[in-house]
């Protein structure tokens, strides 16, 4: 009889062995840090193609985006609760943006957001 080879079935999981380093210890898998860095960079290149950004400035911009995101998410969540709704829609987000951002900045943000939602729905 021919020896049978073990074939991994679909959905089965294998134990992954850690790779060893030169010193003989096990290599640790580094946890990935999520960031808006690539998107900030893409927007920068659209606005100012010949301008760069330092890593420290990128950290500050990433922190800024996270802060604004949390403020908008929190405010839109509150608005949904006030209106006894369990889902945050684009309407709650738009109202939250109007409440959080001042004057002209809110108008521009709302128009850009509306444009992005329209582009997304037409592409489907």
Curated annotation (Swiss-Prot):
PANTHER family the UniProt entry points to: HISTONE H2B
Keywords (A to Z) from UniProt: Chromosome, DNA-binding, Glycoprotein, Isopeptide bond, Nucleosome core, Nucleus, Ubl conjugation
GO CC annotation terms, alphabetical: nucleosome; nucleus
GO molecular function: DNA binding; protein heterodimerization activity; structural constituent of chromatin
Claim: Ribonucleoprotein is one of the keywords in the record: no
Family statement: Belongs to the histone H2B family.
Subcellular localization: Nucleus; Chromosome
Classification via Pfam families: Histone
Role, per record: Core component of nucleosome. Nucleosomes wrap and compact DNA into chromatin, limiting DNA accessibility to the cellular machineries which require DNA as a template. Histones thereby play a central role in transcription regulation, DNA repair, DNA replication and chromosomal stability. DNA accessibility is regulated via a complex set of post-translational modifications of histones, also called histone code, and nucleosome remodeling.
Organism from which the protein derives: Strongylocentrotus purpuratus
Renumbered residue ranges of the record's region Disordered: 1-31
Gene3D superfamilies in alphabetical order: Histone, subunit A
Glycosylation site positions: 111
InterPro entries: Histone-fold (IPR009072), Histone_H2A/H2B/H3 (IPR007125), Histone_H2B (IPR000558), HISTONE_H2B_site (IPR055333)
Keyword Nucleus: yes
CDD domains the UniProt entry points to: HFD_H2B (cd22910)
Protein known as: Histone H2B, embryonic
Oligomeric and partner information: The nucleosome is a histone octamer containing two molecules each of H2A, H2B, H3 and H4 assembled in one H3-H4 heterotetramer and two H2A-H2B heterodimers. The octamer wraps approximately 147 bp of DNA.
Covalent crosslink: Glycyl lysine isopeptide (Lys-Gly) (interchain with G-Cter in ubiquitin): 119
PTM info: Monoubiquitination of Lys-119 gives a specific tag for epigenetic transcriptional activation and is also prerequisite for histone H3 'Lys-4' and 'Lys-79' methylation. GlcNAcylation at Ser-111 promotes monoubiquitination of Lys-119. It fluctuates in response to extracellular glucose, and associates with transcribed genes.
């Amino acid at each position: 009889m021919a020896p049978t080879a073990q074939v991994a079935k679909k959905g089965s999981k294998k134990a992954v062995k850690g790779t060893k380093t030169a010193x003989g210890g096990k290599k640790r898998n580094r946890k990935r840090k999520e960031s808006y860095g690539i998107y900030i960079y893409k927007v920068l290149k659209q606005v100012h193609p010949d301008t760069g950004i330092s890593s420290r400035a990128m950290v500050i911009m990433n922190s800024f985006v996270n802060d604004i995101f949390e403020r908008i998410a929190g405010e839109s969540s509150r608005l949904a609760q006030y209106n006894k709704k369990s889902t945050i829609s684009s309407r709650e987000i738009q109202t939250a943006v109007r409440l959080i951002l001042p004057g002209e900045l809110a108008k521009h943000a709302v128009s850009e957001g509306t444009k992005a939602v329209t582009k997304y729905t037409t592409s489907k």
